[in-house]
């Protein structure tokens, strides 16, 4: 283990002892915000320090076994102990290196998932609906909460565009690799000749700002228009201008919300989505240089960047970024994304390790 890494782990061990002392004090819950910060930090550091304690024990076992090697009668036993200790040290050091990788500050945040139909007309809109269901089913498996923010249904079903808010611990960390172009190959229900059609949708996954104020938005930079909602909604739908369109003039970002009968609620939702879009834009601009110098799974944020193909006749899904093909398309479309996400997270961690190696 490198000296720099061991020094960092020693610092974390000291910090954990400090946290244990702070959390054991009688008045610890007097400031609930501070208490939450301390417990969150404790939860993050605890497993790392525990792993480090196991590594130090393995190191002590290695030194003890080396001393036994001098005794001829104990040599076979000592060699077995030495091998076991070194194996444990190697495994624990590798796990610790992964645990110490830089954390994405957005990983724990709630998210907005925006799906837009692309090339392929009605078939693309239908696939947008399929993708939405896939993410909703995955969210259900994680016991996350889902809220529809905005939807623009297509004539034959599916969506021209849809935005949902997914709230749950680690939502961004699990779904941040979904941004990009998703291509589908299948025989549409309206196809009489049995020909396979190719269409596409784009997905954008944006971390939710903790508060609207986290992203600086000058009210003077906003143009807010109201109009009558369209689509399902019964008699009420054409009576009031409850739908809201918010335009952020400096960036040209436009958000429409019309799902609620309350203009106030639609405006509030639109501003939340707008804040997330601006935050997402700033994030990708900030990382543009990094994305240009090395391949990154999160990419440039370019919607046209094709990341995945869903081939229904062959029952396969291929993620082009990591050259992963899974022949379990039906399960994937039903929200079984664990294997795919685990592979993407693993590749991302490998990228981070490589970049740290380059920096050293």
From Swiss-Prot:
GO cellular component entries: cytoplasm
SMART domains hit by this protein: PCRF
Subcellular location: Cytoplasm
Pfam families: PCRF (PF03462), RF-1 (PF00472)
Chief subcellular location: cytoplasm
Keyword terms: Cytoplasm, Methylation, Protein biosynthesis
Post-translational modification, as annotated: Methylated by PrmC. Methylation increases the termination efficiency of RF1.
Family of the protein in this entry: Belongs to the prokaryotic/mitochondrial release factor family.
Function according to Swiss-Prot or TrEMBL: Peptide chain release factor 1 directs the termination of translation in response to the peptide chain termination codons UAG and UAA.
Protein name (record): Peptide chain release factor 1
């Amino acid at each position: 283990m490198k000296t720099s890494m061991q020094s960092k782990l020693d610092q974390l061990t000291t910090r954990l002892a400090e946290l244990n002392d702070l959390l054991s004090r009688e008045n610890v819950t007097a400031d609930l915000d501070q208490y939450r910060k301390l417990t969150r930090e404790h939860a993050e550091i605890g497993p790392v320090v525990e792993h480090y304690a196991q590594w130090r024990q393995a190191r002590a076992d290695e030194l003890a076994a080396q001393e036994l090697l001098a005794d001829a009668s104990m040599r076979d036993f000592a060699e077995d102990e030495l091998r076991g200790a070194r194996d444990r040290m190697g495994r624990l050091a590798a796990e610790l290196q992964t645990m110490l990788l830089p954390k994405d500050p957005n990983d724990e945040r709630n998210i907005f998932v925006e799906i837009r139909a692309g090339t392929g007309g009605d078939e693309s809109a239908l696939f947008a609906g399929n993708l939405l269901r896939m993410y909703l089913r995955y969210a259900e498996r994680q016991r996350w909460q889902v809220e529809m923010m905005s939807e623009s249904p297509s004539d034959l079903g599916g969506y021209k565009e849809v935005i949902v808010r997914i709230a749950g611990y680690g939502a961004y960390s699990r779904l941040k690799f979904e941004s990009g172009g998703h291509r589908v190959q299948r025989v549409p229900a309206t196809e009489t000749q049995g020909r396979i059609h190719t269409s596409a949708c784009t997905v954008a996954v944006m971390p939710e700002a903790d508060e609207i104020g986290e992203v600086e938005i000058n009210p003077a930079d906003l143009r807010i228009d109201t109009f009558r909602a369209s689509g399902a909604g019964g008699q009420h739908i054409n009576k009031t201008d409850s739908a809201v369109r918010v335009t952020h003039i400096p960036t040209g970002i436009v958000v429409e919300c019309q799902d609620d009968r309350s203009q106030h609620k639609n405006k509030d939702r639109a501003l939340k989505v707008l804040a997330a879009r601006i935050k997402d834009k700033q994030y990708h601009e900030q990382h543009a240089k990094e994305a240009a110098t090395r391949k990154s799974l999160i990419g440039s944020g370019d919607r046209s960047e094709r990341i995945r193909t869903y081939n229904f006749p062959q029952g396969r899904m291929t993620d082009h970024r990591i050259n992963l093909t899974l022949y379990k398309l039906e399960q994937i479309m039903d929200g079984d994304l664990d294997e795919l996400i685990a592979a993407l997270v693993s590749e991302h961690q490998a990228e981070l390790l490589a970049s740290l190696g380059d920096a050293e």
